[in-house]
Amino acid sequence: MNGPPPASFPAFDVSKSERTDALTVVGLTVTYRIRGRDREVLHDISLRVRRGEAYGLVGESGCGKSTMAMATLRYLPRNGKVKAGKILIAGQDVQALDADALRTMRATAISMVYQDPGRALNPSMTIARQVAEAFEAAGATRSDALTRTLEMLRRVRIAAPERVMDSYPHQLSGGMQQRVVIAMALASNPALLILDEPTTGLDATVEAEVLDLVAQLRKELGTAVLFISHNLAVIGRMCERVGVLYAGKLVEEGATQDVFARPRHPYTVGLLRCLPTSGRSKTLERLDTIAGQLPAPGSITQGCIYADRCRLADDRCRRDAPPPHRVAAAHGDQMSRCHYHERAMELPRATADTPSPRASVGDAAPAQAAAPGTLVLRAERVSKTFHVSGVALKAVDDVSLDLATGETLGLVGESGSGKTTLAKLMLGLLSPDAGSILELDGMPLPARVTRRNDEQVKSLQIVFQNPDSALNRSHSVKRLIGRALSRLAALRGAAQDERLAALTAAVRLPNRYLGARTRQLSGGLKQRVAIARAFAGEPRVVVCDEPTSALDVSVQASILNLLADLQRERGTSYVFISHDLHVVRYLSDRIAVLYLGRLLEIGPAAAVFDGPHHPYTEALLSSAPALDAAPHGERIRLSGEVPSAAAPPSGCVFHTRCPRKLGAVCEQQDPPFIDAGDGHRIRCHIPIQDLRTLQCAPRNA
C-alpha cells in the first residue's frame, strides 16, 4: 500500500470536496430499465477521490462496481440512467456536459483500463496506430503522436518498443497487451484513471509487474486511480482508501489499513474471512463463506439490505435501515452502515455447506476407492512437442511425477509453463512424445482418450476454468448431469434419477435449479453443475484447471470447501492448476512448479511455501499479493519475458531471468534435482543450505 491518506480525509463526507479533487460523487442513484420498470442498481452513493490518490472499490459481482465506473464515464447502456446525484471530474459536472465537452473530457481528463485487454485492443490495427490515436485525441499531431507513443511504450516498461509498435495485439502476451492499454489510457495524462479488474487472469509475476507499473506512473504523473477489483489483497497493496459496495450501496469506507485490519461491517468481515490467506490449509480449517445471495436488482428491502445474509442481524436490522455511522480510526474516519458496527468483528465464523457424513453419492462408498496414499496416477519422463510451421515447440520436457489416492497436486507456473498441456496429456486429450509413460493404478494408460476403456475414461475427468464454455446453454441442468450419468455410469430411468438427486445434493446444488438453463445460473452455481458432471462416474482423478479464477471470493470459498469435502468423502485425487498461489496452498498436499515445460521444484505444500525454494518459486511467491504478508525487503522482479519454447535457453531454462544465477554453470549445464528433505526436491545448481541462507536474508532489490 502507498501509505495512509491524510487524517483530514473524513470518510463519506463530500462536503469538503474541492475542485482539484479528481472525482466527487454526491448522492448517486442509477437505475436500469428492465422488463418495463426502473430497477435501482446504485443507491445514494457519495465518495471522493483526491488528486493523486488511489481509491479501491470492492464487492461481489452484481454489487454495482462496474456500473459505478460506467456512470462516471457517462457510458451507461441505453437502459441505464442517472436518476439522482452528481458526478464531478476535476470539478466538471459530467451530467451537464454537452457532446463536444464530454468528448473532450474523455480525451483529456479521464481514462479507463478494462479487465480484458484483448477485447479493448483492435485486432486489425498495429499497436503504434492504436496508441497514437489516443495522443491525437488529446491534441497531438500525427508525427508527434508516434514519437510520444514510443516514449510511452518505454515508460510502461515494454521491452523492444520499436518492434512492439509494428506488432498486432494477438502477437503480444496478456501482460504486454495490458501494458499497451495502460499506455493508451495515460496518453492524455488524465486526472482520473479507472482500473476495472485490470489484473484478473494474469500470472502472479505479470500481475505484480502491472501493479508496480501503475504505482510508479501514479507517482510520476500524479494521476488519481479508482481501482475496481474483487481481489482484496490487490486493493490492500495499491489503495490508500477503500469503499465496500453491497447491492448498490456503499456499506463501509475508510483508510484501507483501517478497514482491512478492523472492519466495521459484517459484509466486509465476511469477505476478508473467505480468503485462503497464508498458513490456511484444507487439513486445518474450512474457509468461511457468506450464506445466501445478493438481492435482485431493484429489490425493495425494508431495513438493512444485508440483513438476510448477516449472522448479527436482529429485528431492528430488518426493520430500520442503518444510517452511515462515522467512527474515528487510526488513519482517519471510517464509515459503516451497520447498527452494530462495534460488534462486526464478533461475527460468528461460518463455514456453510458443512460436509455431511455420507461417504458417496450412492448408498455405499465408491467401489473403486483405494487405501489412502495408494499410488493412483504416475507420469514418467513425459514430454510433448508441438510442430508449428516447421518449428518444434517443446511444451512439456521430461516431467516425472505421481499422484496418490485422496491427494491434491498443485501445478503452478506462468502462462506457457506447460501446466495445462501436462494435464491434457494425463487426460488423453493430447498424445505425448515417444518414451513418455503414463500409468493408472499401476497399469499402462493409453495415450489417447479414444483408445482408453470406459473405466479409464471415467476415472479421469476435468473441471474447466469457464463453465460457460463447458456446458451446453440450451440444456437444462438435469439433462446435463443426466447425460453424464448415462455416459459415465450407464444409468437410466429411476436409477439415474436416484443417483442424480444424490449427486446434486453432494455438490450442494438446490433442486429448484434442475429445470433451469445454465444461462440462468450464477457463476458459482454453473461451476457446481460442472463439478457434478465430473463426479458422475465416480472418478479417481479430477483435473481442476483454474476452477475458481473467475469467481468472487465468497463463491470461491464455497467451491474450495466443496472440493475438499468431496475429496474427504470419496478419496478423489486432484490435479489443481491455478495462478492464485494462496488458493493452491490451501487445497494442495503437494505442489509442482513448472517453467518452460520443465519441472523445477516439487514437494509438500508447506515445504514449497516455507522454503528453501527454487529461485523461480521464490519470485512467484514474492509477487503474490497477500493481506497478511509480512514485508521482507523488495519484491523480486524477473527481467524480460518467458523465452520461446521453440528456442529454450541452454543449461538451466531459468538462467536468463534468474536473479540468483551463479554464472557459466547455470548457462551451460542442466541442473540436477537436489534433495531438501521429506520429498521436497529442487532443480538448481545452488546447494540447499546456500539457498536457505540467501532466501532468509533481507532483500534490497
Residue ranges of predicted features:
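A short, proline-enriched helix->beta-strand linker immediately N-terminal to the Walker B motif
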Residues: 187-191, 536-540
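Helix-to-loop junction immediately C-terminal to a conserved catalytic motif
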Residues: 73, 77, 427
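Conserved ABC ATPase "signature" region
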Residues: 144-163, 272, 495-512, 621-622
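Conserved ABC ATPase signature
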Residues: 167-172, 176, 517-521, 525
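P-loop NTP-binding/switch modules centered on Walker-like glycine-rich loops
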Residues: 60, 74, 198, 202-283, ...
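Charged, flexible cofactor/metal-binding loops and thiol motifs
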Residues: 9-12, 19, 255-376, 605-701
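ABC ATPase NBD coupling module
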Residues: 94-111, 137, 258-263, 295-301, ...
